[in-house]
């Protein structure tokens, strides 16, 4: 049994398989998940698990080079934006419109669905390298 890091076997497998620039998405419970993209559904009820809890665990176990957010988060969920920036201080941040964000999710290796129910609580994490 693992002692630390991501314990969810599906998430751990996806993280282990990522190459440089591959992407994964951590999403609120409302983001549409495109056909053909691996869905890892953690949502058990509204708010559980939270977006920020899942982001923290994944970020602790992943080399992240870049972060993509919907620009709408700036005016519609400033608290989540602030918390993301506090948790992810090293990567480059990119902002795109929500429709473009949803297009980008089609290329993700996986989308991790949380129970989060606040607007635009979604992030695309671009894998970096550990060397």
UniProtKB/Swiss-Prot annotation:
It catalyses: beta-D-ribopyranose = beta-D-ribofuranose. GO terms for cellular component: cytosol. Pathway: Carbohydrate metabolism; D-ribose degradation; D-ribose 5-phosphate from beta-D-ribopyranose: step 1/2. Homodecamer. Belongs to the RbsD / FucU family. RbsD subfamily. Catalyzes the interconversion of beta-pyran and beta-furan forms of D-ribose. This is D-ribose pyranase. It comes from Bacillus cereus (strain ZK / E33L). The gene is rbsD.
């Amino acid at each position: 049994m693992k002692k630390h890091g991501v314990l969810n076997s599906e998430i751990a497998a996806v993280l282990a398989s990522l190459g440089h620039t591959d992407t994964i998405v951590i999403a609120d419970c409302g983001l549409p998940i495109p056909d053909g993209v691996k869905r890892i559904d953690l949502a058990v009820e509204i708010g559980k698990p939270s977006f920020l809890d899942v982001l923290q665990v994944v970020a602790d176990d992943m080399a992240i080079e870049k972060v993509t957010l919907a620009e709408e988060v700036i005016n519609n969920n400033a608290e989540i934006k602030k918390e993301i920036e506090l948790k992810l201080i090293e990567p480059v941040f990119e902002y795109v419109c929500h429709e473009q964000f949803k297009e980008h999710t089609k290329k993700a290796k996986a989308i991790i669905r949380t129970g989060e129910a606040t607007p635009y609580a979604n992030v695309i994490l671009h894998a970096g390298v550990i060397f």
